[in-house]
Amino acid sequence: MSGMRAVRLLAVVALGMALVACAARPPFTVVKVTLSDFKYSSKVIEIPAGQKVGFEMTNVGTTEHDVMIHMGGFHYLIQPGATVRRNVGPLPAGEYQVQCTIPGHKELGMSATLVVR
């Protein structure tokens, strides 16, 4: 009988630890951005402040493009047909400019605004 009680107690402790581990994780948002010739899938990208964010960026165009967010350190070149995933944050509230830095692409419309609130 004591062996069965030990198994039950172990199961309850394991379940409790699993619930605590799930509850301890901070919120996480995934933002999907599609790059094409010559635009991003959205002109305004909104994300919550104070949370880590995962960006999934897919280039469906025929030309290489990049994504640079004017917040320091976020600049990724993405080849045609490729997907790049990167995590950032948490970010402070504000507006950040997003653009393709390949010459002429921003002027053709490859820019957006990242709004963090």
Question: Where are the language model's segments positioned?
Answer:
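Bacterial signal peptide processing site
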Residues: A23-R25
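Short beta-strand/loop motifs in extracellular/secreted proteins, especially
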Residues: V53, T63-H65
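Bacterial N-terminal signal peptides that target proteins for export
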Residues: M1-A11
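N-terminal edge beta-strand
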Residues: P27-G50
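Asparagine-centered strand-capping/turn motif at beta-strand->loop junctions
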Residues: M57-N59
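Beta-strand-rich interaction surfaces with strong enrichment in secreted/lumenal proteins
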Residues: S42-I45, G73-L77, R86-V88
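C-terminal motif of bacterial Sec signal peptides marking the signal peptidase cleavage site
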Residues: A18-A21
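Extracellular/periplasmic metallocenter environments
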Residues: P80-R117
